[in-house]
Amino acid sequence: SLVIGDRDSKGTNRFAHAEMLKRIIAGHFTWSPKMQELVKSNAIEAYCFPGGVIQALLREIGAGRPGLFTHVGLGSFVDPRNGGGKSNECTTDDLVELIEIDGETKLRYRPFKVDYAILRGTYADPRGNVSLEEEAIDMDSYSMALAAHNSGGKVFVQVRDV
């Protein structure tokens, strides 16, 4: 998630309830003050990863691959030597590990189960095919849907018309 919202009641703020979430993995929490409160109070587990890493990792999860291998994040807050992107004390699982490939140090962002993908589309047909033709941006909708589907999760799509 890139934590979309309006800093009030829209976007991911709608899901900012400890009873609804166990964990969030996001690029930032700027637009969701309610999510920030859950993270600060240790009500949910929270990871902060670079947005591009999240998008690429969702593609890897959707494809059933063993995670994302990259140099992105080395030496930063997502490096396991610097906290592994964990945003609070109740977040304990290691989702990032150091590995060596061909003599170079890389990070492996481990795959995880995606329980839900909540997306926006323009049109859908009765078979579940969705068109994004009039959406402003697709933000890797296909990768998110595939990651949820292949994790055994659910895909919800809001559309204008069927």
Give the location of each predicted region.
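Conserved alpha/beta enzyme-core scaffold
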Residues: 1-162
